[in-house]
Amino acid sequence: MSETFTEISPHQAWELIENEGATLADIRDGRRYAYSHPQDAFHLTNESYGRFLDEVDYEEPVIVMCYHGVSSRNTAQFLVEQGFDRVYSVKGGFDGWERSGLPIETAY
């Protein structure tokens, strides 16, 4: 089991999702998530954490995303401490994801 998470680019995150079925956890606030979020992202909040634990395999890769890639680091480290084996944080967060032209779902 890894003792820390790894920071990766938005494109590396997309490759993990496409090639290894990684779960992307978006930790931004509900309003922003509802407005737009990466395609198929799980909205991880204090309230949804139990469902997250039920749905996500501890051995599968988990990628955490926030607004700019800062607060996701704390959540990524928390998930490592909870026993997840492969945890990543997206450099640049959702802003970087969107600028990279990767798939997003929007309310508009």
UniProtKB/Swiss-Prot annotation:
PROSITE patterns: RHODANESE_3. This is Thiosulfate sulfurtransferase GlpE. Pfam families: Rhodanese. InterPro entries: GlpE_sulfurtransferase (IPR050229), Rhodanese-like_dom (IPR001763), Rhodanese-like_dom_sf (IPR036873), Thiosulf_sulfurTrfase (IPR023695). Keywords: Cytoplasm, Transferase. The lineage of its organism: Bacteria, Pseudomonadati, Pseudomonadota, Gammaproteobacteria, Pasteurellales. It is found in: Cytoplasm. It catalyses: thiosulfate + hydrogen cyanide = thiocyanate + sulfite + 2 H(+); thiosulfate + [thioredoxin]-dithiol = [thioredoxin]-disulfide + hydrogen sulfide + sulfite + 2 H(+). Transferase that catalyzes the transfer of sulfur from thiosulfate to thiophilic acceptors such as cyanide or dithiols. May function in a CysM-independent thiosulfate assimilation pathway by catalyzing the conversion of thiosulfate to sulfite, which can then be used for L-cysteine biosynthesis. NCBIfam families: PRK00162.1 (NF001195). GO terms for biological process: glycerol metabolic process.
